[in-house]
Regions:
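Flexible, processing/modification-adjacent segments and terminal tails
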Residues: 27-35, 41-45, 99-169, 174, ...
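N-terminal mature ectodomain segment of secretory-pathway/periplasmic proteins
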Residues: 23-107, 141-143
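Bacterial N-terminal signal peptides
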Residues: 12-22
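Bacterial N-terminal signal peptides that target proteins for export
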Residues: 2-13
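Subset-of-secretome marker
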Residues: 63-67, 79, 122-123, 190-193, ...
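Solvent-exposed coil/turn segments that connect beta secondary-structure elements
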Residues: 56, 77, 85-87, 97-100, ...
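Gly/Pro-enriched, hydrophobic low-complexity segments
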Residues: 29-30, 151-246
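Gram-negative outer-membrane assembly/targeting C-terminal domains
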Residues: 245-283
Length: 283
């Protein structure tokens, strides 16, 4: 009788301990806002940055350019400018304190950012709160975090209960707290959503901050764009007018004047066609 009772005493605490361990495993996964705080600290430490890079359009057709040279100017944490040049076209994209504008071949074509512009937002925003709001806007549930494995590295997966759940999510390296993958839904006329994945790789430390030397875009699992950094310079002084949206509006005319209606033809139509071709690479 004593032996039987002794067995029960050993088994019951073990079962209770197992329940307690399983019930508290979830608590040891760090929460989204804290992870963003750790990540932004790793990226912070400089005032400005000049980046020169090569962009490969892996999905380009035979008639279009397959690459572009691009210069980025970061004025942390609010301003950004991209100047891209291919064989046929030039594109300027500016973001300043929440306002944006795009110029293609010297003509203003609107200010909306495309999915191919957003990779820089994780690198630009140095405020946990601003980045938190931006990720929520992209569809990520910041209250949910899981563990995942990617390329033999353990990662925190913000936005998913399981790492491969078909939801927008951000992967952060568990050891370095640097972003690895950002998965978003791209706007599409198709019934099924188009998934775009942004991968950040080959991180290098420059001064007191980190920057990825390679960024790859995948659409439905297939690589469609690759960015490779040629050079980085930090803490430079940029002319403020480079980021001044109002100044740029005065400098560059709209593709079509606001008071002009009706079809376009001749030279203007050719300009519009070249703009549309270059635009497709960024939409």
């Amino acid at each position: 009788m004593l032996k039987k009772t002794g067995i029960k005493i050993v088994i019951v605490p073990a079962a209770v301990l197992l329940v307690l361990i399983c019930g508290t495993c979830e608590a040891y996964i760090l929460r989204g806002p804290y992870l963003l705080d750790r990540m932004t600290r790793k990226l912070d430490g400089i005032q400005s940055m000049l980046v020169t890079q090569q962009v490969q359009f892996l999905d380009a057709d035979e008639n279009g350019s397959s690459q572009a040279e691009e210069t980025l100017r970061y004025l942390f944490p609010q301003s950004f400018r991209s100047d891209a040049r291919s064989e046929e076209s030039q594109r300027i994209h500016v973001v300043d304190h929440g306002r944006s504008m795009t110029v293609i071949n010297g003509k203003r074509v609107g200010g909306d950012e495309t999915v191919f512009d957003i990779y820089k937002e994780i690198l630009l925003f140095r405020s946990r709160e601003r980045l938190n709001d931006r990720l929520i806007d992209s569809g990520i549930d910041m209250s949910v975090v899981a563990y995942g494995r990617f390329e033999d590295k353990i990662a925190f997966v913000i936005g998913a209960e399981k790492p491969d759940d078909p939801v927008p999510r951000l992967w952060i390296d568990k050891e370095t707290f640097l972003p690895m993958r950002w998965l978003v839904k791209k706007k599409s006329a198709e019934a099924d959503p188009v998934w775009v994945e942004i991968r950040y790789a080959d991180w290098r430390r420059i001064d007191h901050a980190w920057y990825p030397m390679q960024i790859t875009y995948l659409q439905d699992g297939e690589p469609i764009r690759e960015i490779r950094v040629d050079s980085l310079k930090t803490n430079l002084t940029f002319p403020q007018e480079l980021f001044d949206v109002e100044h740029l509006k005065e400098k560059y005319a709209a593709l079509l004047p606001e008071d002009k209606a009706g079809p376009v033809s001749g030279e203007l139509n050719e300009i519009e066609q070249s703009i549309d071709e270059f635009r497709k690479k960024y939409e």
